[in-house]
Amino acid sequence: MEIAISYKPNPLISSSTQLLKRSKSFGLVRFPAKYGLGATRKKQLFRVYASESSSGSSSNSDGGFSWVRLAQSIRLGAERIGEKIGESVKTEIGFDSEEASGRVNEYVARVKDSVHKGHHELTRFKNETVPSFIDWNKWEHWKDIRNWDGKRVAALFIYAFALLLSCQRVYVAIQAPRVERERRELTESFMEALIPEPSPGNIEKFKRNMWRKATPKGLKLKRFIEAPDGTLVHDSSYVGENAWDDDLETTEGSLKKIIGRNARIQTEAKKKLSQDLGVSGEIGDSVGNWRERLATWKEMLEREKLSEQLNSSAAKYVVEFDMKEVEKSLREDVIGRTSETEGTRALWISKRWWRYRPKLPYTYFLQKLDSSEVAAVVFTEDLKRLYVTMKEGFPLEYIVDIPLDPYLFETICNAGVEVDLLQKRQIHYFMKVFIALLPGILILWFIRESAMLLLITSKRFLYKKYNQLFDMAYAENFILPVGDVSETKSMYKEVVLGGDVWDLLDELMIYMGNPMQYYEKDVAFVRGVLLSGPPGTGKTLFARTLAKESGLPFVFASGAEFTDSEKSGAAKINEMFSIARRNAPAFVFVDEIDAIAGRHARKDPRRRATFEALIAQLDGEKEKTGIDRFSLRQAVIFICATNRPDELDLEFVRSGRIDRRLYIGLPDAKQRVQIFGVHSAGKNLAEDIDFGKLVFRTVGFSGADIRNLVNEAAIMSVRKGRSYIYQQDIVDVLDKQLLEGMGVLLTEEEQQKCEQSVSYEKKRLLAVHEAGHIVLAHLFPRFDWHAFSQLLPGGKETAVSVFYPREDMVDQGYTTFGYMKMQMVVAHGGRCAERVVFGDNVTDGGKDDLEKITKIAREMVISPQSARLGLTQLVKKIGMVDLPDNPDGELIKYRWDHPHVMPAEMSVEVSELFTRELTRYIEETEELAMNALRANRHILDLITRELLEKSRITGLEVEEKMKDLSPLMFEDFVKPFQINPDDEELLPHKDRVSYQPVDLRAAPLHRS
């Protein structure tokens, strides 16, 4: 915008051209001509056009007063003054104005250059970049999508993003009025909900809250106003009196009830009073909007403030402190502040309990707080003492005994001091102390263990270093002393073993007596001998006998010593064989070898090392033992014993390591008699001792069991006050062991009391039932040995008969078809005897007999000896090839009831035939039992009377009584068939084959 102004020149002033030419020299600082004030203006806002006549200028051109000269003089004076001021400034402060002007001019030149370059770039952008950009964005280039390059794809994403952003901004702009309206509405609603009604009750609540914020908890202030007569009147409405009493605050509902129950107040007065108290409950009672309520609040608070000021001038106050509340409030504040610091200060104080801290007076402590010299304070648990830590100075820590000051915590918080609480009774301090001491404890433990390890290592090194020196001293603990000939013979007589034991003993004695005859011919003799068998059969006794017989060194150990000893098992194995080789020829005996050579020994690292050391010693390789295989030093025989040979590792028992296997089984009847003689030697035996009569009751006994039997018989004889051991003592011990296993052992007096409490009819029924079993058992020529029968054993209302299998049946290890049939017949004896004596009114006391009969009948049906179903697969095994033997020495293997055997799939006809065969066996044996008892009724009655009189009868007594009664015996069901080689007659021939063809037909119950 340009404005043209025409004016007439003042005749007192020279021409404007000259004035303008000299005007650029005004100022305190002198600038170069090219950087004058007029040169810096690019665009003038005002243009002034002036015109003057030439006469005006020429009229004053001669000498005399002139305004131009005056202006020039003033300008020159100003320039000189500016130069002097600049020189003085430069002299005083070192500021050079000319240098500063040069720098400013240089900066201005740079700015002009930058502006010029920017103008050039802007022109280039308008003339080149914009047209090329418009050409690049033409539709002809965009519609050919196949020829798009990466720039065009990126530009598409940028355009899309810009479009979305623009849409979002447009949407925000469109929604801005609505959002602003909602914000205002929300603000209005919030303020409406925030500012309550200015009722007296709300005013009272507000005053209480302000009082609680301004004063500590527990402080109560009572006000007394001075009346005109000079007396003090208690003002109960003062807020300081009940500000902390929450229960005094009356709820709106209770106020309504109080006003409503008052009959002296009229209805209108009640409404007005409710409105004044703010409990009217009507929604329309709100005093305007929140702005009006806020104004009302301000007016009411001003009135309350003015009223308080007026009352306070003529009032007196009484201050009361509830010390319990003050302490409780202080504790809550300290605990709340402590939770932020995590108890680090208190932990530091508790760890440095031993440090001396001087006491600081409480007033000095407050001064230190005011001067911000305190860094942290730690309250004790009883809030009576402070541990103060200063920011600087010496000492840094003090102890302050504090009173119960309600303003103390506020003062501490205002000072910005760290607060903590020392809780000595809480366990987490001890845990933190323990964690702090744990590294030191671990270091001490590591040093101790290192010292122990070094000590153990040095001991092992010394042991290996001086092994040769101490071997012989240790060898005395392993090598049994060699006895003379008489001792050897006596030891030989004490050993009662059968089989190939003595043949093996002779073979070993021949080798150990002259091993050179084998070494000269490069013959490797037996390396290891494995003794196996049930416990107590004499395996260890055989090893001792071998040592006694040979008179050679005998190194012995138990398998448990290699796993439970302090020395490693591998070292002990190497030590044993080293001692044996130094004293070769010698024996090495290890009992319970399965402890170190079992199948699972390799799973344990310690047992695996022991096992590998044993294998290396048995192999006898020179690289491992240092001794050639064919050397006299290798004349060592390894003997081991175990009760479980099937549990040994296969690598251990292979040939070359274990070359001989010897099974030492249970002794037979003859050997048991001999063992009884060995163990009863030196004891006082009565003349009636005949162990041969009781040998059938010791089937399955080992040598150790017989030794225990003799010892128990001796103890019983001493208990009875006898000096000799009688036959009855041995019988009593056998009965005691049997009845203890059944849990029915009683003393004689207790047994008599129990028998007297049972009725005669009950005893007679039990006697008849048991006599039936006894009679049928003795009618078979080769039935099990009958030990004894007893009524009411242990006081129970039952009877028991004890039978032992015969020796030949036990030796053969299997049962026969006839044996099972005999067992069924004898099992029928109890119920059949009741039917013979009492008729068909049979009791249910034979439940166990029926179960046994059914089980045996099923075994007979599925037995291969069955005439009709012997070749039919009626059962199948699950997961097992061989079934183990039955426990308790039973000869009948109940395969049907075995958990790993299940019935095979049968057709309807085979199932029916199975049932018929089962029933047939039961009925046939029952018929045999009934016929035998009817034919031998006199024997049945005799045995019944004996049981009623004595309550006990032995098998020998039954045999003696039956000899004179001419019993009708059964045929022998288990008599073996014997062939006489001298008899030239043909073998007996049966027209009826053992296996009849199966008669399969549909049963009536299964026909359709």
UniProtKB/Swiss-Prot annotation:
UniProt topology in membrane: Multi-pass membrane protein
Say which domain of life the source belongs to. Eukaryota
Q: How is the cofactor bound?
A: Binds 1 zinc ion per subunit.
* Recorded GO CC terms: chloroplast; chloroplast envelope; chloroplast inner membrane; chloroplast thylakoid membrane; mitochondrion; plastid; Ycf2/FtsHi complex
- Entry GO MF terms: ATP binding; ATP hydrolysis activity; ATP-dependent peptidase activity; chloroplast protein-transporting ATPase activity; metal ion binding; metalloendopeptidase activity
- Localization: Plastid, Chloroplast thylakoid membrane
Give TM regions: 154-174, 427-447
Q: What induces it?
A: By high light.
**What cofactor is needed?**
Zn(2+)
- Which EC number(s) are documented for this chain? 3.4.24.-
Q: Which UniProt keywords apply?
A: ATP-binding, Chloroplast, Hydrolase, Membrane, Metal-binding, Metalloprotease, Nucleotide-binding, Plastid, Protease, Thylakoid, Transit peptide, Transmembrane, Transmembrane helix, Zinc
Q: What class of enzyme is it?
A: hydrolase
Q: Where does ATP bind?
A: G533, P534, P535, G536, T537, G538, K539, T540
Q: Where is the transit peptide?
A: 1-49
In Gene Ontology terms, what is a biological process of this protein?
Answer: protein import into chloroplast stroma
Q: Which SUPFAM superfamilies match?
A: FtsH protease domain-like, P-loop containing nucleoside triphosphate hydrolases
Q: Member of which family?
A: In the N-terminal section; belongs to the AAA ATPase family. In the C-terminal section; belongs to the peptidase M41 family.
PANTHER family given in the database record = ATP-DEPENDENT PROTEASE, ATP-DEPENDENT ZINC METALLOPROTEASE FTSH 12, CHLOROPLASTIC
Q: What does this protein do?
A: Probable ATP-dependent zinc metallopeptidase.
Q: What is this protein called?
A: ATP-dependent zinc metalloprotease FTSH 12, chloroplastic
Q: Supply the gene name.
A: FTSH12
